[in-house]
From Swiss-Prot:
Catalyzes the interconversion of 2-phosphoglycerate and 3-phosphoglycerate. It is an enzyme of class 5 (isomerase). The active site is at residues 10, 88. This is Probable phosphoglycerate mutase.
Length: 249
């Protein structure tokens, strides 16, 4: 039995466009991001994909990306599960700061550590900060211990895995075709887990916006292969654009 799982990072957001650390800030798609999502849906349709259920975060840039995909696929009717555990990594007090300006101030190496290291989080938010999730009604029912003030990728992996193990993996094994529309770091968390990527190797992995990533999994949900629905030159350009975000100008 071969299962297919499709992952997609949301299309470009307004803060991606402005090169800002976004994290749990609920910004929308840019005009380019909307176009990326429509193109991704068309690619999935052309490649013959269909889905029984979709998972996304509780942040509008991922939700809107999913809506557009389902529109292109004529699958508005399938169940959609919005899960806070699929949220982007919480960037703490960096949220809202321009990445290039932060790199110029603290150095590219420090920003790379904050953005891409596995176990070093950025500076944390205070609970009194309006950016703290405890001040957002969408998280009102969560235990306070689940609300991050900052996260490294290790924290994001640990936050995501219960959702994978308890909900998404059993759904895939039941034979349902699953689509996940999420964020760069929540997808990196899953990719790291699926491919068993070493902590020091995941640092250099970039997930492009708006390009479907297909995993073919065996009966134990171990990867057989994975591929993007994009040609090599387009994919490389998209990945490089993400990699350049943390560099000083």
């Amino acid at each position: 039995m071969v299962y297919k799982l499709v992952l997609i990072r949301h299309g470009e957001s307004t803060w991606n466009k402005e090169n800002k650390f976004t994290g749990w800030t609920d910004v929308d798609l840019s005009e380019k991001g909307v176009q990326e999502a429509h193109e991704a849906g068309k690619r999935l349709l052309k490649a013959g994909f269909t889905f029984d259920i979709a998972y996304t975060s509780v942040l509008k840039r991922a939700i809107r990306t999913l809506w557009i995909l389902l529109e292109e696929l004529n699958l508005y009717w399938i169940p959609v599960s919005r899960q806070w555990r699929l949220n982007e990594r919480m960037y703490g007090s960096l949220q809202g700061l321009n990445k290039s300006e932060t790199a110029a101030k603290y150095g590219e190496d420090q920003v790379l550590i904050w953005r891409r290291s596995y176990d070093i989080p950025p500076p944390a938010l205070e609970e009194s900060d309006e950016r703290y999730p405890g001040n957002d009604p969408r998280y009102a029912k969560l235990d306070k211990s689940d609300l991050p003030k900052t996260e490294c990728l290790k924290d994001t992996v640990e936050r995501f895995l219960p959702l994978w193990n308890d909900t998404i993996a059993p759904t895939i094994k039941s034979g349902q075709k699953v689509l996940i529309a999420a964020h760069g770091n929540s997808i990196r968390a899953l990719v790291k887990y699926l491919d068993n990527i070493a902590d020091d190797k995941i640092v250099s992995m970039d997930i492009p916006t708006g390009i479907p990533l297909v995993y073919e999994l065996d009966e134990n949900l171990k990867p057989i292969k994975h591929y993007y629905l994009a040609d090599e030159s387009e994919l490389n350009a998209a990945i490089q654009a993400v990699a350049n975000q943390g560099k000083a100008k």
